Design a protein with these regions (language model features):
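Nucleotidyltransferase catalytic core that binds NTPs
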Residues: 2-238, 246
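Phosphate/ribose-recognition catalytic cores of enzymes acting on nucleotide-derived substrates
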Residues: 228-282
Length: 282
């Protein structure tokens, strides 16, 4: 695996790769890698001839009270994991490389509507940071495909929309959520949980499944079901940001005609804000 630290060197390498008519798959990450990230690389290997993974802790998507400085930087361990997964190129740019004019002076990409609700409501400006850095990475790499985990479903839809709206040629591919043995969605934030908190966090996925079962059984009072989900998590001791049932395409409140739904939640357990979702067809 080749590790590259600046944009010019990456683009020179990609010119050579494209001269050989090889397809490029991009896996953007912030590092501190876990099994979910590695699954993205594995899926990219299936569909792309050359896989480029990026590690960039993006300051633009950290809000007030979210500690950018203390986000885990584990480059050595991450490189070993990517090499084991047969990643071809690792791109590790600095903040200066990505935001040469500084965070406040550069262009910001904003995806309206989708960015304002759910996690966007609780983390204002977060998705502008995501959209901006993803646009930069797609422009730098000119990847044929880019791979995103469906655990961050709102982010996945936002990226898919910005690619469509900006006429970018990259195909955005969502990859199924990887889970711990207890059902907890894999996340870098799980590292902050104690053994007891990890066990307690099982309630997130079990509550999503509970509400999904009620919908599949024919219940259609979505407001009431959201309240049940919220209360179930709250009763377990979780600090719940939201529990929502939406259509899977635009994250709007579903009508009775909608058949493809998603149940989404964000809840704080111990020090970690955890998100998860469950897609279902009725």
């Amino acid at each position: 695996m080749q590790t590259i630290f600046n944009t010019a060197d990456l683009q020179k390498q990609l010119v050579k790769i494209r001269a050989n008519k090889l397809s490029v798959g991009l896996v953007p990450t912030m590092g501190n890698l876990h099994g979910g990230h590695i699954r993205l690389v594995e899926e990219a290997k299936k569909l792309s001839e050359i896989v480029v993974s990026t590690i960039f802790v993006n300051p633009m998507q950290f809000g007030e009270g979210e500690d950018f400085a203390n986000y885990p930087r584990t480059l050595g361990k991450d490189k070993a994991k990517l090499e084991a997964a047969n990643c071809d190129i690792l791109f590790v740019p600095t903040v200066e490389e990505i935001y040469g004019e500084g965070l406040s002076a550069g262009t910001v990409i904003s995806v309206p509507d989708l960015s304002l609700d759910l996690c966007g409501n609780k983390r204002p400006g977060h998705f502008d940071g995501v959209a901006t850095v993803v646009t930069k990475l797609l422009n730098i790499s000119r990847a044929d495909q880019a791979f995103f985990g469906l655990k961050d479903y709102q982010q996945y839809l936002i990226v898919r929309k910005l690619v469509k709206d900006l006429s970018l040629p990259t195909q955005i591919i969502g990859v199924k959520t990887e889970r711990e043995t207890n059902g907890l969605a894999m996340s870098s934030r799980n590292n902050y949980l104690s053994v007891d908190e990890k066990q307690k966090a099982e309630v997130i996925f079990s509550t999503l499944k509970l509400i999904a079962e009620k919908i599949i059984a024919g219940e259609r009072n979505y407001v009431a079901l959201e309240k049940i989900g919220f209360q179930t998590l709250q009763n377990s001791g979780a600090e719940v940001d939201y529990f929502a049932i939406r259509n899977d395409e635009f994250l709007q409140t579903p009508t009775l005609r909608n058949r493809n739904l998603i149940i989404l939640t964000a809840a704080k357990i111990g020090p970690s804000r955890l998100i998860d979702n469950l897609l279902l067809t009725i």
